[in-house]
A protein has these predicted regions:
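Alpha-helix/helix-capping structural signal
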Residues: 63, 85-86
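HTH-adjacent hinge/linker in prokaryotic transcriptional regulators
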Residues: 3-58, 69-75, 89-96
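Short glycine/serine/threonine-rich phosphate/pyrophosphate-binding segments
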Residues: 65-68, 172
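Short beta-strand element of Class I
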Residues: 78-81, 98
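Conserved phosphate- and dinucleotide-binding cores of soluble alpha/beta proteins
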Residues: 3, 10, 88-172
Length: 172
């Protein structure tokens, strides 16, 4: 039942959503891709304008970073390193030089994580890192539900000169 899964809480005469539990659900990439897509595309266009030709870029496995790819195709001689499986396909389709981190796959996120991903990231020093997360807490901390993805993201940030969080209005 939804109550046993912690998604609903019974009340007198009905049930209410457990908001905390909803924040812990891994929403599949294909669904996240549809959420706020117009806003993500606008953000992606602006973010891609920051990138110069011949840059080395880290993109995380977020849908927000994924939406940057068509706009990055307008740049010359980029190298993009990503842990995003769907991003690798889109980068290839747009003739952008790309490197996949490899590693263990999180199926719902279509993301590579783990030590193999870390080792690949450590071999590069990127000009830019573009990433997203589940939200921002009241005290300004980035929140997400996937510790393995957080770890990969942290490694990307550590090896980047500049980092930009791609954030839709619902995450603030």
């Amino acid at each position: 039942s939804l109550e046993k899964q912690g998604l609903l809480k019974r009340t007198h005469g009905g049930a209410v959503l457990n908001e905390n539990a909803l924040n812990e659900i891994k929403i599949p990439f294909l669904i996240r891709e549809l959420e706020k897509s117009d806003e993500k595309i606008k953000i992606a266009r602006i973010a891609a304008e920051l990138v110069e030709d011949e840059s080395v870029i880290f993109l995380d496995a977020s849908t927000s970073a994924y939406f940057m790819i068509p706009f990055l195709a307008e740049k010359r001689n980029l190298i993009v390193i990503t842990n995003g499986i769907k991003a690798l396909t889109a980068l290839s389709e747009n003739n952008i030089s790309c490197i996949g981190t490899g590693g263990e796959v999180i199926n719902s996120c279509l993301a590579f994580v783990g030590e193999e991903a870390h080792r690949t990231i450590e071999r590069y020093n990127a000009d830019f890192c573009f990433f997203a997360c589940r939200g921002i807490s009241e005290d300004g901390r980035l929140t997400d539900i996937s510790q393995p993805e957080n770890s990969v993201r942290a490694k990307m940030l550590e090896h980047s000169k500049q980092a930009y969080m791609l954030c839709t209005s619902d995450k603030m």
